[in-house]
Structures are given as structure tokens and as C-alpha cells.
């Protein structure tokens, strides 16, 4: 019987691979300690965070992940905000990102979430094509403002 890949909840043992995926696929240089701390924290907050990994069972290796946070506001129904979707470059184009998003959407629907939204930098044209190919529509162009509180 041929082994298959699977989508599952993230585990602390995934930290090293998640760190690598964040660095290579998203361009975020982050310490292993930070990744471990965040996996622990977010895994315990199941009412507000959905964090799934795609594991290639044949290779016994995590090759991608999706992370979404519950989006609540005074002016809309509950939704999800995608905070990260990443797949290692050598595994891109194989439907992994699509499977992760579908898995997330099914679980969100089961939890009565009414929409999923995400932001993507304007230069990430290939990512935009991907999101459109799985049914997402660009409904707004905006700028991000940030203020550091340290």
C-alpha cells in the first residue's frame, strides 16, 4: 500500500521545519525559540487559531503549513484571517497549498465561520494568481501601517 500525505495539527516537533519554511518560503528570519514558543502558545488557543501542517508521509517531512486566526469585529460576522500559507519551493505546484486551504475552509465552515480573508503583498503576483485560482477575490487595495511598541 502506497503511503500518502496528510494534513494535521501542528506539533512542537515541527518547529525546526516550520522555521525553515518561514525563512525560505516567506522570507522571515526567525529563531527556533520563537517558533517553538509560538507553536506551544497557538496550539493551546484552539478557539482562536487554526494551524495545520502538510506532512509528506513517504519522506516523513512537513513541507507546508497554513495558519489562520479568528477574525471578530463589531461590524461583521466571524471570519478567518490567514496569517500564513507557505510550502517549500521544491513542493510548490503540486496542489499542497490548495489542499491546506481546502482543509482550513472545511474546518472553518464546520465552526460556523462565514468567510476567509487574507492580505498579500503587491509584489507577490504568483501568490495572487494562486488565490484567485482557488476562488478568492481581491476586493480591496490597502496599505499596512505599523508602530513598534518596544
Regions found by a protein language model. Give the residues of each.
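Terminal substrate-recognition subdomain of acyl/acetyltransferases
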Residues: 106, 143-150
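Conserved GNAT acetyl-CoA-binding A-motif
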Residues: 101, 108-120
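Acetyl-CoA-dependent GNAT
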Residues: 5, 9-16, 20-78, 83
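Hydrophobic adenine-recognition pocket in adenosine-nucleotide-binding enzymes
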Residues: 10, 85-87, 120, 136
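Short hydrophobic/aromatic beta-strand or adjacent loop that forms the aromatic wall/cage
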Residues: 49-51, 140-144
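Conserved beta-strand-loop-alpha-helix junction that forms the acyl-donor binding cleft
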Residues: 118-127, 146-149
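Conserved active-site alpha-helix within GNAT-family acetyltransferase domains
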Residues: 98, 122-141
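Conserved acetyl-CoA-binding loop-helix of GNAT-fold acetyltransferases
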Residues: 87, 93-106, 133
